[in-house]
Amino acid sequence: MGEGRRTILITGASAGIGAALARVCAARGHDLILTARREGPLQALAEDLAAAHGVAATAVVADLAEPNAPARLFEAIAARGLRVDGLVNNAGFSRTTGFLATDPADHAAMIRVMLTAPVELSRLALPDMVARGWGRMLNVASLAGQMPATGGDTLYGPIKSFLIKASQGLWLETQGTGVHVTALCPGYTYTEFHDVNGSREQVSAAYPKWMWMDADRVARIGWDAVEANRPRVTPGVANNVLAALGGLLPDALALKMVGGHARRLDRL
């Protein structure tokens, strides 16, 4: 096994793309540190993957919306005698109620979970990765980070754009160190993410099936990309076309087109 057995920390690992990435890493022989807020699903996944693949899988409950959560998470990992060879920044959520109708506390939590926490976790993990001459960092961004802004889910796309740019900067800074950094930019992916934010029926009706991908396929593409040291990967031909168009169209036209989709989704 060319990669060797390493320990990968995955945030938001209890479901969706995070759980799919845990399955991919376990299947490739890596030990796991899985973290999320929900202890039951997290522990069940850890036990299932350990039994299925003969890897060590440790569940550590953490809420990255809480202040200083990344530092406390690393303290808990060290207390268990574990180290982090790879980091998957996957935890995230959205609110689709519009900027003014969303509780400011929810917006603050979004920023902490999807922007501040990845930065802090990266800062905690990278020094040891560089010192050991091996590391993998996969930042789960979104196609939304490459597209024009949408109304309703006002902060989600900008936060994901930040994650893409930060990943590219880290990719440049870690060249020649043995550390690989990749931004994974999935489009519409079948996960429970849409159940949590209440949008599954709306998005399923608004977009054709060919625009959707399976979480396990997205996870495989993402992990293959970080192993290949690609700075960014957007799974799916359709998603790559959309990302390219999003960068080429004039702002006024692009925003008008995206605004039409937002109205179809009742300001999703």
Where are these regions (language model features)?
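Conserved NAD(P)H cofactor-binding loop of Rossmann-fold oxidoreductase domains
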Residues: 90-95
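Active-site helix of classical SDR
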Residues: 122, 158-159
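Conserved glycine-rich Rossmann-like NAD(P)H-binding loop of the short-chain dehydrogenase/reductase
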Residues: 28-45
